[in-house]
């Protein structure tokens, strides 16, 4: 049985997305490979960190003044009392994400003033 590339390509053109997905999975399992794109070199990671323009504010601990922290979280996020309490109780958790550096620092200062431990990511 000769392998005819043109016939294979023609069959793939007529296949559905579901069939193609199953084919990829079967090839990955059979040949122990992955279809994922290769990751960029580590040198590019340093440049990406220097040019970071989006920050997440993470509450790592509520501290001793939990009520003040919950009040501040409500003001920052617009959450209700129950949701804000659950967020604070679930620390470490992200309070707000996708912020500019100045916005993230402003929120960090407010929460730290209320007694929380904060990290910016």
UniProtKB/Swiss-Prot annotation:
<dbReference type="InterPro" id="IPR014719">
    <property type="entry name" value="Ribosomal_bL12_C/ClpS-like"/>
</dbReference>
<protein>
    <recommendedName>
        <fullName>Large ribosomal subunit protein bL12</fullName>
    </recommendedName>
</protein>
<dbReference type="GO" id="GO:0006412">
    <property type="term" value="P:translation"/>
</dbReference>
<keyword id="KW-0689">Ribosomal protein</keyword>
<dbReference type="GO" id="GO:0003729">
    <property type="term" value="F:mRNA binding"/>
</dbReference>
<dbReference type="Pfam" id="PF00542">
    <property type="entry name" value="Ribosomal_L12"/>
</dbReference>
<comment type="similarity">
    <text>Belongs to the bacterial ribosomal protein bL12 family.</text>
</comment>
<dbReference type="InterPro" id="IPR008932">
    <property type="entry name" value="Ribosomal_bL12_oligo"/>
</dbReference>
<dbReference type="GO" id="GO:0003735">
    <property type="term" value="F:structural constituent of ribosome"/>
</dbReference>
<dbReference type="Pfam" id="PF16320">
    <property type="entry name" value="Ribosomal_L12_N"/>
</dbReference>
<comment type="function">
    <text>Forms part of the ribosomal stalk which helps the ribosome interact with GTP-bound translation factors. Is thus essential for accurate translation.</text>
</comment>
<dbReference type="GO" id="GO:0022625">
    <property type="term" value="C:cytosolic large ribosomal subunit"/>
</dbReference>
<dbReference type="InterPro" id="IPR036235">
    <property type="entry name" value="Ribosomal_bL12_oligo_N_sf"/>
</dbReference>
<dbReference type="InterPro" id="IPR013823">
    <property type="entry name" value="Ribosomal_bL12_C"/>
</dbReference>
<dbReference type="InterPro" id="IPR000206">
    <property type="entry name" value="Ribosomal_bL12"/>
</dbReference>
<comment type="subunit">
    <text>Homodimer. Part of the ribosomal stalk of the 50S ribosomal subunit. Forms a multimeric L10(L12)X complex, where L10 forms an elongated spine to which 2 to 4 L12 dimers bind in a sequential fashion. Binds GTP-bound translation factors.</text>
</comment>
<keyword id="KW-0687">Ribonucleoprotein</keyword>
């Amino acid at each position: 049985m000769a392998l005819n590339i043109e016939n294979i390509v023609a069959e793939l053109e007529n296949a559905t997305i579901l069939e193609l997905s199953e084919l990829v999975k079967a090839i990955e399992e059979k040949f122990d490979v992955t279809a994922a794109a290769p990751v960029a070199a580590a040198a590019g990671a340093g440049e990406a960190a220097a040019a970071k323009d989006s920050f997440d504010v993470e509450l790592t601990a509520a501290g001793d003044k939990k009520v003040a922290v919950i009040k501040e979280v409500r003001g920052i996020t617009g959450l209700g009392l129950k949701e804000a309490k659950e967020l604070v109780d679930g620390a470490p958790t992200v309070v707000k994400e996708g912020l500019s550096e100045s916005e993230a620092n402003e929120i960090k200062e407010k929460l730290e003033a209320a007694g929380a431990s904060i990290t910016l990511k």
